[in-house]
């Protein structure tokens, strides 16, 4: 609201024309194109906040109708949670950052948040905006560099990345560090939404409470996916579950320690260079398939220990390495130089945000 009325401003460099449909008006109101960069504006003689829909026409004459992402305002979140995240004492940081399918003012969509303190700009890109980082630019909402945007009408299952502009001229595409799902290696993208819920074996849950390593000995088999003698091109999580079940029953192990369960993009054969700490590897199926593998092992009375490495992470350009141009998660120069073949760098543990990230992922 301004003194003269209700000002609507839209930046759509992909649009030929933009109009708005206001609930209190029968006809759409045409926005004036203010400059060639794609800035549109209109002043509506109404002295109150109104709900409106954007009608965006592209160069092919196709019109897209959507709610303005910037008309919703900030999502309510206690400052205490943001402060705990910055202090390294927020142990459920995945509820604060990443993507969340939710509603705002009765409109469904996806809320995105990411931490990038050194970035000049952060945008959400995907097929839904033709991977154009100029369209859904995020708002910096905290002093320590958390960015946020709510994109209405977006649904679960959409592939996306963050386009991050560094100081200078560099612009890179990054996976969401808090994404619960990541697609396959070559075209790795983060995916909106949560994996489907899978009900665990009730009998196993009760049995697990009784097994504490005191009244019954544990025998643990350490195994990595790459070591399983199956056809890697065709194997899936259920194939792995069947192989492990057969092997464990033949050898008498009670637990399996599985290495390399998080998303790893380095192809050196090592399981240390993790790139996705909240998403299981998509090489053998979806995150939901991974849950079914866990359930199948539990159905056969096999306990599971997931190997989780918080000592260092991978240097794939799509991952958290140099995430915001200032390497907020780690160090620009790897500290573990005696093992360069592992393609890893170390975490900056002195930063509270990094500690919250790691503890929350356990």
Predicted regions and their residues:
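The feature marks proteins involved in alpha-glucan
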Residues: 1-7, 34-116, 141-222, 230-232, ...
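Short proline/glycine-enriched turn/loop motifs at strand-loop junctions of beta-rich domains
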Residues: 11-17, 115-122
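Short beta-strand elements bearing conserved aromatic residues within extracellular beta-rich modules
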Residues: 18-20, 122-124, 160
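Short Gly/aromatic-enriched secondary-structure transition segments
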Residues: 24-25, 127-129, 138, 176-181
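Short, surface-exposed loop motifs enriched in S/T, G, D/E and P with embedded aromatic residues
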Residues: 27-35, 134-141
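An acidic- and aromatic-residue-enriched active-site/binding cleft used to recognize and process polar
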Residues: 117-119, 127-129, 165-167, 261-263, ...
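Substrate-binding/active-site clefts of carbohydrate-active enzymes
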Residues: 181-183, 202-218, 222-362
